């Protein structure tokens, strides 16, 4: 059958018009639910357009307390999956829900603006990237707006560079090959994950002072994990000061104190209504017993707790004896290369009877005369390698500060 040319052309135009009228489908989706992700499930993600998504970092399967409650989250981690072949633009609205926090759990900040000033950036790593890159956000109320191009494949986005429970297990397995390292399982979490402790010392028969170092008490504080990696790598190196350190001390390192919180993408606690392991026995949790029993067994001469708080410009030097602290800051002054200066809080007076709420460091100081210190190393302006190097420098400087200073005029 012969179709007139003008009718055939009209048919092509109609087909083309129908195709043009079909909505554009972009091959983008948000993936959560992996180890350490936050939100924890797709219920914390809302799609608002073909390439526009809203995320709720405070979403929990069950109501939480402290930094696990609505408007208090300190964790963020998700993936953007581009199933196409070309890079695609995406807009992600990260809704921290500051104004929805219950009054008893309202963030301890002067204003929403201060709270969001710590949440105006994320770190991004594409499928071909070797390292994390910082990306700044536009802030509107308590929402951070991220606009980026994502290549084909999976692009991972977090508030801070992540460090998972699996990462820690692999690190422990690697360093355990060193003859100076022995690994001990000191307990299990409520969900059955092992709490592993490294003992690092040389094989001389001399008596050793015990040093206890721990990281990841608070689940979101991944800088503690990278700092402890830097410390451990230094202790098993051939550096002269490291060799002297393991000759004098037996270092006991707990690199992952809160594995359930880290694995499940929490902020501060061991569970949505769980324990804060900073303190001795804040709530019923078997990890409280593990930490206290370990401290009682070791009676450490030195205790180090590694954290990273949210402040961008301030490193924390907390609870160190004044004489040791003064020497420490000579060996490790303000880290101006990262735009940081020390906030110093001297130890609280030791009391004979325990207070209602006592940190593990204060407990060790009160019971065993331990030199105890907490460090806070915020991420902003630092890379993963920077934090590892900061950990190494911190331990070196602290051990130098612990030494008896030479008498004036006695040097040779």
Can you say where each PLM-predicted feature lies in the sequence?
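N-terminal secretory signal peptides that target proteins for export/translocation
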Residues: 1-3
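Bacterial N-terminal signal peptides
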Residues: 6-16
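Bacterial Sec-dependent signal peptides at the C-terminal "C-region" and cleavage site
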Residues: 14-24
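Extreme N-terminal flexible tails
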Residues: 22-151
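Glycine/proline-rich low-complexity spacer/linker segments in large multi-domain proteins
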Residues: 106-113, 165-184, 233
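Extended acidic/polar, glycine-enriched regions
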Residues: 139-179
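Active-site-adjacent mobile loop/cap segments within catalytic or ligand-binding domains
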Residues: 162, 317-318, 353-412
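Active-site/substrate-binding loop(s) of hydrolase catalytic cores
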Residues: 182-201, 205-345, 365, 370-379
